[in-house]
A protein has these predicted regions:
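Conserved functional micro-motifs across diverse proteins
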Residues: 1-151
Length: 151
């Protein structure tokens, strides 16, 4: 995969391809540190969206996400849900240097198959920026509902 080696999207100009535009998390650094688990799960009819949050502490931060490194395991049935892709991108692997976003929270949004009814406890295997982690979570603790838009 041949990506630009460094991206400065602080001005979010039209020249930057859409798949590289950086979306910042709708939270403060304090809210991030107060989270029990640095992730949200949104259940939709056709898919499950898992948003993992990463603190960007440096002026230049290497973002490296490969969908093959992510899975959800139902702790009761041992069913495994493999990551389908990165939300908003056709790429299965993205890697780039994020510049000028020091002290911000970066969301990594991953698409999974829809979770079966009755799923309560999950193990989420992650590997962002070559840091493997497993989060054991209760679905009700990390379930996030998007605000409604009323017209």
């Amino acid at each position: 995969l041949n990506l630009e080696s460094a991206i400065d999207d602080t001005k979010n100009t039209a020249k930057l391809p859409r798949k590289y535009r950086t979306k910042l998390a709708p939270m403060t650094i304090n809210e991030y540190y107060e989270m029990r688990h640095p992730l949200w799960i949104e259940k939709h009819k056709d898919f499950t969206l898992v948003t993992l949050f990463r603190y960007v502490g440096l002026d230049c931060y290497r973002v490296d996400v490969n969908v093959d490194n992510f899975k959800i395991i139902d702790m009761n049935t041992k069913d495994t849900y493999k990551c389908r892709g990165i939300y908003g991108s056709n790429e299965k692997h993205i890697a780039y240097d994020l510049m000028n976003h020091q002290h911000t929270i970066l969301p990594v949004e991953l698409v999974f198959p829809p979770l079966e009814d009755g799923v309560e406890k999950l193990a989420i295997d992650t590997n962002i920026d070559n840091i493997p982690m497993t989060h054991i979570v209760s679905l009700k603790d990390v379930l996030h509902k998007s605000p409604k838009i009323i017209r």
